[in-house]
Amino acid sequence: MRLYVAPMDATVVEVSGDGRVRFENEEWTTPTLQERRAIIYAAEIEVAALQELMEILESGKV
């Protein structure tokens, strides 16, 4: 996984089942409330962009 989180200028590369994250070139850490919110926001934006891509490709209008 690679998720760029613009407000933090950081990239999430792994997430554990207990909620810890690993940012690129860093060790595992438990994100603060602000960091969690920033990660969730970035993920929601990425999901929306991927959904739009899927809709375009599935419509066959490429």
Over which residues does each language-model region extend?
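Alpha-helical coiled-coil heptad-repeat register
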Residues: 37-54, 58
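Short intrinsically disordered terminal tails
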Residues: 1-2, 58-62
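N-terminal acidic leader/helix
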Residues: 1-38
